[in-house]
């Protein structure tokens, strides 16, 4: 089994990476393969609603989203990480997730998802709530921890001093590994993911 961890920070080895690395370490101790993907240093354009991804199976932009989507096909779980910018996730990870989930939402359904956020001081819970919405609109089991998945610090060294935050990351990794193994055991026992009904659309203005 494999989990993809996505770093949406502009600092490839900064605070967000430090938190993701702690999650990855816990997953690997439980026998889960991991890969940390850096996207925050790349210019990621937002979705323009052209629907090319729905027609052609991929976004017309070639900036890393399509490459991630290919890897997502064989991944079993996901952790998305972001620094906190104005009490929100970074613009880069937001654009990245908008396009990945809009174009290929079926790839993520039934697979566990989690997010982590990193901040110097405040705004973590608002950014955390924002990122979780990608999972809860897409039939993904959301993996939780002992607290909201956040770390505090202005440098990687300061993040490592956030003992509760780092423990929260390890607990998150352990919980995701447990859920992945439960899903695998369920499949082996003949328990499949619930079949979805045909989608119903409600517009408030007709």
Ranges and model annotations:
Residues 2-30:
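N-terminal beta1-alpha1 ligand-phosphate binding loop
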Residues 6-9, 39, 117-120:
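Cofactor-binding loop segments of dinucleotide-utilizing enzymes, especially the Rossmann-like FAD-
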Residues 32-42:
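A short beta-strand-loop structural module common to alpha/beta enzyme folds
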Residues 141-206:
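Glycine-rich phosphate/pyrophosphate-binding loop and the adjoining helix
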């Amino acid at each position: 089994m494999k989990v993809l961890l996505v770093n949406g920070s502009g600092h490839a080895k900064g605070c967000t990476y430090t938190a993701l690395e702690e999650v990855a370490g816990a997953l690997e101790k439980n026998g889960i393969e991991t890969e940390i993907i850096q996207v925050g240093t790349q210019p990621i354009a937002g979705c323009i609603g052209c629907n090319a991804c729905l027609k052609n199976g991929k976004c017309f932009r070639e900036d890393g989203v399509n490459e991630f989507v290919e890897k997502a096909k064989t991944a079993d779980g996901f952790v998305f990480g972001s620094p906190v910018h104005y009490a929100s996730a970074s613009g880069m990870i937001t654009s990245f997730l908008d396009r990945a989930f809009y174009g290929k939402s079926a790839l993520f359904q039934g697979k566990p998802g989690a997010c982590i956020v990193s901040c110097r001081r405040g705004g973590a819970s608002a950014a955390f709530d924002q990122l979780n919405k990608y999972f809860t609109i897409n039939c993904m089991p959301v993996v939780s921890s002992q607290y909201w998945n956040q770390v505090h610090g202005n440098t990687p060294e300061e993040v490592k001093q956030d003992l509760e935050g780092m423990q929260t990351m390890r607990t998150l990794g352990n919980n995701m590994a447990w859920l992945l193994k439960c899903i695998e055991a369920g499949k082996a026992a003949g328990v499949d993911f619930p079949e979805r009904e045909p989608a119903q659309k409600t517009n408030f203005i007709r």
